[in-house]
From Swiss-Prot:
The gene is glmU. CDD domains: GT2_GlmU_N_bac (cd02540), LbH_GlmU_C (cd03353). Mg(2+) binds at D102, N224. Its EC number is 2.7.7.23, 2.3.1.157. Catalyzes the last two sequential reactions in the de novo biosynthetic pathway for UDP-N-acetylglucosamine (UDP-GlcNAc). The C-terminal domain catalyzes the transfer of acetyl group from acetyl coenzyme A to glucosamine-1-phosphate (GlcN-1-P) to produce N-acetylglucosamine-1-phosphate (GlcNAc-1-P), which is converted into UDP-GlcNAc by the transfer of uridine 5-monophosphate (from uridine 5-triphosphate), a reaction catalyzed by the N-terminal domain. This is Bifunctional protein GlmU.
Amino acid sequence: MNNIHAIILAAGKGTRMNSTKPKVLQILSNNTLLEHVLSQVKTLCNKIHIAYGFEGKQVQQKINNPSINWVKQVKQLGTGHAVAQVMPYIEGNSISLILYGDVPLIKRSTLYDLINKTQQSGIALLSVILNNPTGYGRIIRNNKQIQAIVEQKDASNMQLNINEVNTGIMAINSQLLKQYLNEIDSRNTQGELYLTDIIACAAADKKTISSIISKNKFEVLGVNDKVQLAELERLFQKDQAIQFMKQGLGLKDPTRFDCRGTLTFGQNCEIDVNTLIKGKVALGNSTTIEPNCIIKNTIIGNHVSIFPNCVIEDAVIGEGVTIGPFVHIRPQTHIQTHAKIGNFVEIKKSTIGKNTKISHLSYVGDSTIGKNVNIGAGVITCNYDGVNKHQTIIADGAFIGSDSQLIAPIKIGKNAKIGAGSTITKSVSENQLSVSRTKQKNLKYRSKK
């Protein structure tokens, strides 16, 4: 493609958001609105320019991209004024692609087509047909040729009946853009410089104005308040879920699935309702996730079964593992193949060996547990002394009886056994049985008189 400059307008405060953050930093599926736009243009353009205003330092710090040219719009005097602030940095022999930081679902493929149209005609608009066009600038045509764009507040009653509207997104030869920006004025109800007025200038100049009518109205929707943001989130999530399903992922209900990050998966994977994926998550083949689970930054192997109401964060789960229900696996945990983690178990910063079972009501923290170990119900690794965390090591084949406490730092040897109800404060050697209990007393029961 020719020399392409992206101009992203991101100066608005977003008053209706009622937020200390500027509108373009509101979050949609784990990324800011502006980051969504940038992700679609970064491979299309030679240079990206962002016109910023409200809380500009906050915006720049969040994006943190030194290759972007940041241009301050001191006064918000309209879209034409915003673009004019950027023009000193635009090369004449180029195409300017103009976008908005609060229109986050625009597709790269649409922008690619728009640029191609511009290379043929010099100007190309992106429009959309809406059943209810209220609030949008109308596309005015004469014999199918675009003549102007009229904003809602300046439109006549006849023009208000038009349902083809301007999305604001356009591509234009940069020399023409500079020329027509010098020809527009602020004689309108808003007293602003409308970027859309350059279309009337081009039509008067007998220029052919091309257009693409978006087939997907959702990709050109803007965001003005938290209600619209939530609506757009649902549209984004459903569209993403459908794409996953087309790639082979089984989703019980695509409207009740959220991926706020990236998800890769093998064949025959099934995810039930109300599952949230965050960060980078990878699923192997034939893995199932049942309802109400949260999976974050985790690698999950083949043939893993995750039962309802589990939270798994920053972990590695080996092949054939079963987890849940009601399990919390915290960061830096590695569960090796065919281990079983049962209901109401919490594991933190630990390695759980092959074929090991932790079936009920246990806490395991800062521990290394070998293979073929059985951890009974209610076992606690007491890893914190009030100041420091300490490690528990349990070797292969050990058996830890129910309701035992292991006071770290401690090591339980290979094939050792801990009797139920014990509090173990000293390490136990290989093949030893350790029991720590007070002597049982059976006292005569005295009934009340």
